[in-house]
Amino acid sequence: MTMTGGHHHDAHHEDFQLKDTNPLLGEQWPKGAAGPARPAVGGGIAGWLGLEKPSSTYDLVEQMFFLYVRVVKAKDLPPNPITGSPMDPYVEVKLGNYKGTTKHYDRRANPEWDQVFAFSKSRVQSNVLEVYLKDKEMLGRDDYVGRVVFDLAEVPTRVPPDSPLAPQWYRLEERRVGGGGDGGGLKVRGELMLAVWIGTQADEAFPEAWHSDAATVRGEGVASVRSKAYVSPKLWYLRVNVIEAQDVQPQARGRAPEVFVKAQVGNQILKTSVVAAPTLNPRWNEDLVFVVAEPFEEQLLLTVEDRVTPRKDDLLGRAALPLALFEKRLDHRPFVQSRWFDLEKFGIGGAIEGETRRELRFASRVHVRACLEGAYHVMDESTMYISDTRPTARQLWKPPVGVLEVGILGAAGLQPMKNRDGRGTTDAYCVAKYGQKWVRTRTMLGTFSPTWNEQYTWEVFDPCTVITIGVFDNNHLGNGNGNGNNAGGGGGGSPPARDARVGKIRIRLSTLETDRVYTHAYPLIVLQPSGVKKMGELRLAVRFTCLSLMNMVHLYTQPLLPRMHYLHPFTVTQLDALRYQAMGIVAARLGRAEPPLRREVVEYMLDVESHMWSMRRSKANFFRAVSLFSGAAAAARWFADVCHWKNVATTALVHVLLLILVWYPELILPTVFLYMFMIGLWNYRRRPRHPPHMDTKMSWAEAVHPDELDEEFDTFPTSRQQDVVYMRYDRLRSVAGRIQTVVGDMATQGERLQSLLGWRDPRATCLFVVFCLVAAVVLYVTPFRVVALVAGLYLLRHPRFRSRLPAVPSNFFRRLPSRADSML
């Protein structure tokens, strides 16, 4: 949507602001509190909150209570009464209207499940828990075998760090005639090992449990709704220094080969320059750098090729080298030993056997120096939002300086992301990424105000880093198809479903005060082809705890990245290419986890498209620069007013200050630093109280033109109509022309400065040289204080003594030549 509406603009912008929240954090165990289904007198589920418990480490989330049921195994089950063979048992756990079932086993008398069910207290409408054992193959009749009944008022409470509750054996009983729910039926053959307790989301069983909130999810979708933690693969830079090759034999005799080496690791391909080899021993001495991940599954494939024509390359030999062959370098000093590798022949030589094949195989070889660089930090995210700066090798890591704790409380006001059963809905989950650790909350189904209340912790090795938290809509809920309940799925020929972006936020740790809990609702803002849109709010509780203040302060004096990035830096082009290769590896590895963290999620969190051209971003960056220099411009205007005596009192005070500084020059630097100290103290009262958040106004998202938005969302290469592309190209040429003019003017001024002593204009240079000689003599015989005083008084002279024409130095400088005259 385009930002219009006049007086509604301020209210609309206010909707994008950060909001304070006051959640009730930490564990709450009020004595004698009742659940929603507590009877009027005794019984019921009052026992859920009838005990006072000590607080645990989950103090940044609102306490949530669950009834946990662990179904471990069964024994001594009766056979099928019809066939006489062992039954196909499964267990059904029923609490009110909620039912959860284990998988069934074929013909098993002593099955083992070890499955946990979790029922949310807020949705329980019963005071009795029933656990049924059933036979799946008893068709056409009641498959009921036996049950175990629990009164919720008698269920014990358990919260970490308490030890896990030990499961017990329970005899199965018959269902009482009349449907009574309080147990007491006749005992039947068979026993179930169960553990039933009241716990919170801090329980160890919480992440892997079946949740009543996701009772409608079946099959493969069950795994995709659970909370999970992931670890990024350990990435290394593989540096391959291709030195030379020996005895390279071209396939076509009588010509000097033009040889290059192509190196490939996985889908990464790099080539050396093409070198003419009249002596058949070409030399390159070029570095090729790749990104590889542990465990090293790929090989380094080196191929030597001959550039016959611009479109034809002949393969002369190859060598396949396992990555484990190369040593790991942890510093810039150790010398890596180079090695010769034999090249295996291709073409005709590849089909020859015996001695001839061995001769061909060892006829050519390549000289390589390769190592795995462990002293670099492998970039897999945008450098502006980096979350980790540690080198690859663990031996080089410093101790952590702090701990970051994030409580993901919930969201509010989410927008419908798809249609299900004829109405809009959202199945939201959160992903948080900091350092090598990724976390994913459970999916809350069919709600626009999901409540997660999950807390996660990260070690902090550098406070000048950023945590990224994103919200996504889960489109992989199973139900027998690949796209779950995604409304855009379509037929069988539709592309695979993708988890839709709801929005994300970033928090820079250095902007947080230590040991303070920040509880805010962050706006989830996304830019769509129709304009900027608020997708809801994400409620977080964040705390940054300092472990060592001295180490943290010391970090501010250290380089942001490891030493190798400065001793042996990569080029900007190399870093960009390596970053995208690292992103691809991380996305591929996390996509192979179970449940997978999907590629579209990883790419959105890592800002894979942050380099793409955007007129909106260009405008935003331009106005950021304008805002940056606005203070200097204001100071220049104030000084011009002082020089022109706009305010006589101010000009008089400046004269007094000039006299003091001229006669006491030793006060200049102390005055400057004391002034900055006082400004810092004055600004302390107005220091930012909240973490920064997405600013739609600064991002130029509220006033962006619809066509510029459409261009930003265009594919690469473009997929728009030809006339639209022509129009955008002309617009880009217009913008680039203005930039070209500004850059040319800057170059002209610099070249005029160079020409002062360059004798390109002999008269101007002669005048300047004579002026320098006179100035040297005058400044030598005149005290510095007198010179400074005269210069200051001349600069502050009254307008009566000023001319409206440009000054003599300006006239002289503008007449100097530049190289603009030599441009075509």
Swiss-Prot record:
GO terms for biological process: flower development; long-day photoperiodism, flowering; positive regulation of flower development; positive regulation of long-day photoperiodism, flowering. SMART domains: C2. It comes from the Eukaryota. It is found in: Endoplasmic reticulum membrane. Coiled coil: none annotated. CDD domains: C2B_MCTP_PRT_plant, C2C_MCTP_PRT_plant, C2D_MCTP_PRT_plant. The chain crosses the membrane at residues 625-645, 657-677, 764-784. Belongs to the MCTP family. This is FT-interacting protein 1. Keywords: Endoplasmic reticulum, Flowering, Membrane, Repeat, Transmembrane, Transmembrane helix. It is a multi-pass membrane protein. Pfam families: C2 (PF00168), PRT_C (PF08372). Disruption phenotype: Delayed flowering phenotype under long day conditions. Interacts with RFT1 and PI4KG4. Involved in the export of the long day-specific flower-promoting signal (florigen) RFT1 from the phloem companion cells to sieve elements. Promotes flowering under long days through the transport of RFT1 from the leaves to the shoot apical meristem (SAM). One of its GO terms (cellular component) is plasmodesmatal endoplasmic reticulum.
